[in-house]
A protein has these predicted regions:
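Transmembrane alpha-helices and immediately adjacent membrane-cytoplasm interface residues
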Residues: 1-3
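Soluble cytosolic regulatory domains appended to membrane proteins
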Residues: 6-177, 181-190
């Protein structure tokens, strides 16, 4: 048959065609693809084309802490295990879950899980290392960048065995209107 008709090529679908097939499967009663699966697949196909500025949450202006830096890492001030401590009050000022740690020039370095940090300091009553609650975000400065380009930069790797930072597991859109995109924002689309 190949000699008469030629080799049969694999037919690849354009993304728009795949989306239409999924929509039709979603609506068909006899389809093996249920509505939830189809919606997840459609969202998955769409997510890489969205501009990064369409995802995540705006950051509260009070969610930024500028700290001195030594050897590329922020130097956290000494703090007391008290709700009245000035540094802890700064971390809590916005009431938001995440705080951006920047250098003295305002360049972002890390994001801190403010809720986890404050809970540990105030209720565990043991020495708390702020770095244990910090993540190194993927910093993006172009709000039009497709989300798919930033997603591929998300990963976990420890730079050294003593490095407690979780690296590249959140995206920080660093513009005049900063936004934070976490894994839960991305999973919420699926």
């Amino acid at each position: 048959l190949d000699a008469w008709l030629g080799k049969e090529a694999i037919q690849y679908f354009r993304e728009a065609d795949l989306k239409e097939i999924l929509r039709r499967h979603m609506l068909a009663e006899e389809s093996e693809v249920n509505r939830t699966e189809a919606i997840g697949a459609l969202n998955f196909l769409t997510i890489d084309d969205l501009p990064i500025e369409s995802e995540g949450v705006d950051l509260d202006p009070r969610s930024f802490l500028r700290l001195p830096v030594r050897n590329g890492m922020p130097v956290f001030p000494h703090f007391r295990e008290s709700p009245e401590d000035p540094f802890l009050r700064q971390v809590e000022a916005s009431g938001k879950a995440w705080v951006v740690i920047a250098d003295e020039a305002g360049e972002p370095l890390l994001i801190m899980d403010a809720d986890g940090f404050l809970r540990h300091v105030l209720f565990q009553r043991q020495r708390t290392d702020p770095l244990a609650f910090c993540h190194r975000p993927v910093v993006v400065r172009d709000p039009a960048m497709p989300l798919g380009e930033a997603i591929v930069r998300l990963r976990f790797h420890a730079e050294a065995s003593e490095d407690d930072l979780i690296d590249d597991d959140a995206i920080l859109l660093w513009t005049d209107a900063p936004r934070l995109i976490t894994g839960s924002d991305l999973l919420g689309r699926l």
